[in-house]
Amino acid sequence: MRKIYFVCLMVLGLSANATIQDYDLYIVSDSLNLIDNSKLPYKVFTNSASFQGKNVIYNINEGDTLRLNVHNTDSDIHHFQVKGMAYPATIIPANDSVIVEMVFPDAGSYIYYDPLNYPDNKSMGLAGMINVKDHSYSSFYWNIKDFQKSKSLNIDAGNVEVWNDYYPNYFTINSKSNPAINADTDARVTGSVGDTIYIYMVNTGQSIHSMHYHGYHLEIMHSSHEPSHVGRIKDTFPLYPMETLVLRLIPDKPGEYPVHDHNLVAVTANMVYPNGMFITLLIAD
């Protein structure tokens, strides 16, 4: 095991309540069960050595240190990196582990991923989210992905993939599609009229997704792609590959309202509608 410290230098003004959050993280390979009962070769970052369908979602506070003991249970070398953090990728040999340590001084959402042979390993599933909070409001988390099944099978077979002809045919939030996604308590937005609700979104796929909210307008609190858009209030939010958004919702009426990708092919699973990127908000009086 190697121990590697990466400390962000922008530490002025960090909270006196900042803590060190320490976790084990495992790279595990298996298959993802898709909504049409087919399987997709898949790799994930999990919190145990057993396969779990979705990547771990980390939630920490502004100024906290995140210390991860990353175990590679796979037979291949993998890398670990957090997009936007100023340090190189960490190499993790097969059946070995490393410790990485990072300080997060700024609130927002960050993507951790495997950049090796980019985007192959990331497209096989190895990309998750780290959410850095400056509030204590109810929060929900969406890790958005898209897959072209034939490419996943080709990479899994050890072949070289070409990405200039990418046509994804499966689309997930937290590794689930409609209707299964509504059973995911991390993703399914619930609350009451007048609540303050935060929605953290990362796009770890290869396509742009334009997420459209019915029923409400939301405020942009963080945008990695367009920081100047913070404060804008609207109902549709483009989310570019490997970029992040944090939105704030204060519901003004009760009801159940859909959220879906405006690129309607992403609301399908292998062209079956609406088995893709479609979820509902459930707001009580």
Task: Give, region by region, the residue ranges found by the protein language model.
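Intrinsic, low-complexity N-terminal interaction/targeting segments
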Residues: 218-237
